[in-house]
Amino acid sequence: MLYWLLYQKLFPYFRPFRIFRYLTFRTAFASLTALLIALLIGPYVIEKLREFQIGQYIREEGPQAHQKKAGTPTMGGVLICIAILLPTLLWSDLSDPFVWIVMLSTLAFGAIGFADDYIKVVHRRNLGLTARAKMTYQILASAAIGVALVVLQGQGSYSTDLMVPFAKSLRPRFSIPALLHVPHLAYFAFIPFVIFVIIVIVGSSNAVNLTDGLDGLAIGCTIIAAGALTVLTYVSGHAVFADYLELQRMPMVGEVTIFCGAMVGASIGFLWYNAHPAQIFMGDVGSLALGGAIATVAVVIKQELLLPFIGGIFVLEALSVILQVGSYKLRKKRIFKMAPLHHHFELIGWSESKVIVRFWIAALVFALFALTTLKLR
C-alpha cells in the first residue's frame, strides 16, 4: 500500500520518495514495523486472552516442571500473523503474485491452527482437530499452493525444476514428460511437483508445531530460519547476485524478501513476551502458520532441498518423534526418554533455559551452513 502510494503515485511529485523503490529499505522497514506491532499490541492480546480464559492445557504425562505453565495465555500466533501480514501489505508490491502466495499460505495454515486451538480451549483438553482432519486441511492448502505455482510456471514466472545444492548444473524436472504436449492434459504433467510441495509444506508446518514445546524455542529458531530465508530470497530475486551465485534468476520473488523481513521482526517481537518464563504461547495458530510460511518461501525461491538445514532444529525434532514412534511400534522400546527431542534433554537433567539456548545455537549453525552452500556450487 505504501509502496503503491508513495513510490508509484507520489514519486513524480516528490523525488525523495525514490527510496521506496529499494527492496532493502522496504524490507528493513517491514521488519521494524512488524517488531513495533508485536511489541505494542502484545500486552493487549495477552490481556484479552486472559479475559477470555484462553489458557494452555498441559498434558499430565509431560515433564512435571511444565505443570506450572497451565493456564498461560495461548493462541498468541494471532499476534504473529497480524505482525507479519500488515507490514507485508504496507511495504510490498502487491501486484507480485508470489507475495500473495506466501501471505495466503500463512493465513491458511494459521486458520487450521486457530481451529485446532479453539477446540482445545472449548473442550479444555490437549486434543484439538482429529489428526485426519488436520492433515486433510494441510494437504488441501499445500496442494492449492502447488497448483498456483504450476499456473505461474505456465506464465513463465516460475520453474518447477528442482535446484540441487552443490550441483549447479543438476536440475531434476518434477513433471511427466509424456503429458507435457498433450492438449488439455499439460497441467496434469506437474502432479509430481504438487505432491512434492505437499510433502515439503505439510512436513515443515508439523515440524515447527512439534518444536513449540519450550518457552521461546520455536520462535527463536524461526527468527534464525527467517533471517536465512531473507538473504536467500534477496539474492534469488537480484539479477546480479543470482547470476554470480549461479542461482535460477527469479526477479519476481524479490518482493518476498519483505515478507521474510516482516517474519523476522514479528518473531523478535513475539519472543519479547514468549521468552522464559513465557507470558504467552503461540499455539497451533502460530506454529502451523510459521511452518507453512517458511516452507512456502523455500518452495517459491527453489531452495526446498536447503530447508532441512535452514530449519535444522525443526527437522531434528520431527525426526525424533518419527524414530520414537517407529521404534516403539517395531521393538516396543523407546530411543529417547521422551519425544520431541527437547523433552529428552530436559529429562536427562538440562534446565529449560539451557535446552533453549543450545538449540538456538544449533539452529544458527545449521542456517549458516545453508548460506555457505550459495558459494559451494
UniProtKB/Swiss-Prot annotation:
Q: How does it sit in the membrane?
A: Multi-pass membrane protein
Q: Output one GO BP term.
A: cell division
Q: Which residues cross the membrane?
A: 27-47, 71-91, 94-114, 139-159, 182-202, 216-236, 252-272, 280-300, 305-325, 354-374
For molecular function, the Gene Ontology terms on record are: metal ion binding; phospho-N-acetylmuramoyl-pentapeptide-transferase activity; UDP-N-acetylmuramoyl-L-alanyl-D-glutamyl-meso-2,6-diaminopimelyl-D-alanyl-D-alanine:undecaprenyl-phosphate transferase activity
Associated pathway: Cell wall biogenesis; peptidoglycan biosynthesis
What CDD domains does the record point to?
GT_MraY
> Could you give one GO CC term from the UniProt record?
plasma membrane
- PROSITE patterns in UniProt: MRAY_2
One Pfam family here: Glycos_transf_4
* Substrates-to-products reaction catalysed: UDP-N-acetyl-alpha-D-muramoyl-L-alanyl-gamma-D-glutamyl-meso-2,6-diaminopimeloyl-D-alanyl-D-alanine + di-trans,octa-cis-undecaprenyl phosphate = di-trans,octa-cis-undecaprenyl diphospho-N-acetyl-alpha-D-muramoyl-L-alanyl-D-glutamyl-meso-2,6-diaminopimeloyl-D-alanyl-D-alanine + UMP
Which residues does UniProt call coiled coil? none
> What keywords are annotated for this sequence in UniProt?
Cell cycle, Cell division, Cell inner membrane, Cell membrane, Cell shape, Cell wall biogenesis/degradation, Magnesium, Membrane, Metal-binding, Peptidoglycan synthesis, Transferase, Transmembrane, Transmembrane helix
Required cofactor(s): Mg(2+)
Q: Does the keyword Phosphoprotein apply?
A: no
Q: Could you tell me where this protein is found in the cell?
A: Cell inner membrane
**EC number, UniProt record:** 2.7.8.13
Function recorded in the entry: Catalyzes the initial step of the lipid cycle reactions in the biosynthesis of the cell wall peptidoglycan: transfers peptidoglycan precursor phospho-MurNAc-pentapeptide from UDP-MurNAc-pentapeptide onto the lipid carrier undecaprenyl phosphate, yielding undecaprenyl-pyrophosphoryl-MurNAc-pentapeptide, known as lipid I.
Family, according to the entry, reads as follows: Belongs to the glycosyltransferase 4 family. MraY subfamily.
Protein name (record)? Phospho-N-acetylmuramoyl-pentapeptide-transferase
Name of encoding gene: mraY
